[in-house]
Amino acid sequence: MNNLYQRDCLRLLDFTSLELQNIITLAQKLKQYKKNNKEIQLLKKKNIALIFEKESTRTRCSFEVAAFDQGAHVTYLGPGSTHLGTKESIEDTAKILGRLYDGIQYRGHHHSTIEILAKNSKVPVWNGLTEKFHPTQLLADLLTIKEIFPERKFYEIKCAYVGDAHNNMGNSLLEAASLVGLDLRLVAPKECWPEKNIFKFCKEQIKNKKGNIICTENINEGVKNVDFIYTDVWVSMGESKEVWKKRIELLSSYQVNSLMLKITNNPQVKVLHCLPALHDQKTCTVKSILKKYGFKNGMEITDEVFQKNQKIIFEQAENRLHTIKAILVSSLLKTIKF
């Protein structure tokens, strides 16, 4: 019996440490099957609803391709194409979608919305991103880390997340570290540290996993001897220009660049980025943002560092597909046979 059957994925703490590592192992198998053209369609006749209140490239494509590869059908419900929470309550929408579909993905603004969907739909609900958590991204990150260091335990791996940690990525990184025992350093000004209650809980949980979690403003302390430096954009579309200005001023000295890589004292240090990245000026939007705030060579990461690490970064992005596929398979099948 598959103990993940009919389970939601709203945040990583929905799973035990063993369950999380089993999902990663399943993702490795599914990735290998796809690479070898030996995909086994386990989700035939399954129907999946994809609710996107916030638009996306990687999340939408990963869910759609994962479903198609496995023989499932999807319905894309984009921004403005449902009455969710406007003409129809979230509860009522959840109840009807739960009758029509075998599973629901939600990507939107409020974590409370996905909690209501999960409570009322009676089918598995998966979090594609909310303002509080981004679990499918962290599953891809853990798979990427495991592929690079297959022989090492997670508690033997040091990872520094540099930048804004007061967001869904900071919260989900904390939860991931607390479950698998990662040695995690969140390197940011205090104003950009994660929520205290989540940090405190995860700090307590990790004591049983041999790993460690710290928050520090000190870049030298945070990145010394790490195996990975991880960063994300400092600003998001839809936020006010006042928020952008304040955050960029706070984070301007936390850019991932060649000097920061030298500070790690690890010539083999790897760089992760969950994308999109403001590393060059090849789009009008990014060009105008960089010019406005006085950045000539990328914002949160320089183009030089991005290009040197692009193989890993794009592998990390591809791994969204394989880990999401593992979530779909594990939550929609009573038993999993290969």
Curated annotation (Swiss-Prot):
Catalysed conversion reaction: carbamoyl phosphate + L-ornithine = L-citrulline + phosphate + H(+)
UniProt-listed InterPro entries: Asp/Orn_carbamoyltranf_P-bd (IPR006132), Asp/Orn_carbamoylTrfase (IPR006130), Asp/Orn_carbamoylTrfase_sf (IPR036901), Asp_carbamoyltransf_Asp/Orn-bd (IPR006131), Orn/put_carbamltrans (IPR002292), OTCase_ArgI (IPR024904)
Pathway: Amino-acid degradation; L-arginine degradation via ADI pathway; carbamoyl phosphate from L-arginine: step 2/2
Record-stated family: Belongs to the aspartate/ornithine carbamoyltransferase superfamily. OTCase family.
Major site of localization recorded for this protein: cytoplasm
Its job: Reversibly catalyzes the transfer of the carbamoyl group from carbamoyl phosphate (CP) to the N(epsilon) atom of ornithine (ORN) to produce L-citrulline.
Originating species: Buchnera aphidicola subsp. Acyrthosiphon pisum (strain 5A)
NCBIfam families linked: orni_carb_tr
EC number assigned by the record: 2.1.3.3
A Gene Ontology BP annotation from the UniProt entry: arginine catabolic process to ornithine
Keyword terms, alphabetized: Arginine metabolism, Cytoplasm, Transferase
Stated name of the protein: Ornithine carbamoyltransferase
Superkingdom of the organism of origin: Bacteria
GO CC terms: cytoplasm
Keyword Cytoplasm: yes
Pfam families: OTCace, OTCace_N
Locations listed in the record: Cytoplasm
One of the record's GO molecular function terms: ornithine carbamoyltransferase activity
Residues that, per the record, bind L-ornithine: N168, D232, S236, M237
Binding-site residues for carbamoyl phosphate, renumbered to this chain: S56, T57, R58, T59, R107, H134, P135, T136, Q137, C274, L275, R320
